[in-house]
From Swiss-Prot:
Gene3D superfamilies: GPCR, family 2, extracellular hormone receptor domain, Rhodopsin 7-helix transmembrane proteins. Residues 1-24 form the signal peptide. The keyword Transmembrane applies. It comes from the Eukaryota. The chain crosses the membrane at residues 144-167, 175-194, 236-258, 274-295, 314-334, 362-380, 392-414. The lineage of its organism: Eukaryota, Metazoa, Chordata, Craniata, Vertebrata. The gene is Pth2r. This is Parathyroid hormone 2 receptor. It holds the Pfam family HRM.
Amino acid sequence: MAWLETFTYICGWLILSSCLLVRAQLDSDGTITIEEQIVLVMKAKMQCELNITAQLQEGEGNCFPEWDGIICWPRGTVGKMSAVPCPPYVYDFNHKGVAFRHCTPNGTWDSIHGSNKTWANYSDCFLQPDINIGKQEFFESLYILYTVGYSISFGSLAVAILIIGYFRRLHCTRNYIHLHLFVSFMLRAMSIFVKDRVAQAHLGVEALQSLVMQGDLQNFIGGPSVDKSQYVGCKIAVVMFIYFLATNYYWILVEGLYLHNLIFVSFFSDTKYLWGFISIGWGFPAVFVVAWAVARATLADTRCWELSAGDRWIYQAPILAAIGLNFILFLNTVRVLATKIWETNAVGHDMRKQYRKLAKSTLVLVLVFGVHYIVFVCQPHSFSGLWWEIRMHCELFFNSFQGFFVSIVYCYCNGEVQAEVKKMWTRWNLSIDWKRAPPCGGQRYGSVLTTVTHSTSSQSQMGASTRLVLISGKPTKNACRQIDSHVTLPGYVWSSSEQDCQTHSPPEETKEGHRRQGDDSPVMESSRPVAFTLDTEGCKGETHPI
């Protein structure tokens, strides 16, 4: 099977390499900040100035080419309209539309009456109101989806942590790693909620339209910087969001490494490597996140750092490496499972049943290893169309509900956890039964022996008297009588008053051939008390005369 293992590793590395190359050029959420939008506009401006210089050297024209702050207009023909496609570097533009400008017979661009500003028609570049409303509803649905998902995951993970932490029998290295993973999912959810509150700075179409219509885009680009102290809080929120996001990916990797070592490493000491796993999960992400924060504060300290401009690879590359490595571990683990299935089929087992087991195990591994990450990483970003909307819903669904799925796999469906919960439930029911008074006094749990003595003295005319006598002694060798299942409980003592709760029946024959009298028979003409003793080794609740 060496060829299969080699093929698995080759496929894994090829997929990882291609996905890293694609993902490195893409944004993580399909949106850009104002700073990034300005960078794109400035690059277009520089290219336009080079083109204008080249056109001026070619010769004189009617209307000179120029940069109006958004579009680089070419030479215009006298008395005609010039049409230029809406620029693709403006995010919220209709990239299928066209902008218009008029070249007057005087050889100058038409200007707005009463102003020195050049007239241009950008109406076709702006998204239509119905389209804009549709995009807004789409993003609102995504927000509701991942908010509900992260909330459910947070609650289920919190309960799972309490369950595993409460039962001491569940305290082991494997469950310690699970707890760290649960905490990383919870911190990721909390950081996303905080980030949504304090770092909402994405560029909207209304803001861009107002800048374009007012002609203030160039002034905004070159204007004075604002007070940066107001962005300290949101910068901290963004840094913590990126850190907890990275720790979550790396704790998923730790789970994969732990499972992989259990399968492939002989005599694996999980306790020995626990601190190493903790360093990978919490320590290593802090290194590259701090490096990114220092680079951002030094080179591009603008607004909230919600999305970086060119330095995103500092934290994206390690995260993508963790996703790719986890995917390779997943492939290798599935390969081992498939090999075991084929070996089992060779000895005559049901093939369909074995493949169902393989499919079930693979599904669990998909949730544990986070295989959906590698699937979405390899998908190209189109930022439009039905497929992109479906992809965004699927990606955010799995990302937000993954914590809930992991809690089910590692806690709620875990046999050890279920056994401990059942034990606690049984003990709780027994404690409730002990506190509740029995209806007929027929069941007693304790070490006090109850005896009932009927007096036949001369004072019997005054009525029978009942008293409790503590009797000590060894049980006789009489045969054990069959009693109900409560005798098997520790500390149970059979009481003669239990006959009061039973239906009267004829006396039954004992093994010695004697007949036993029920409690409804006349009082025995004997002054000897009837003692009830508890023998832990022999019969329970045996009676004998003293």
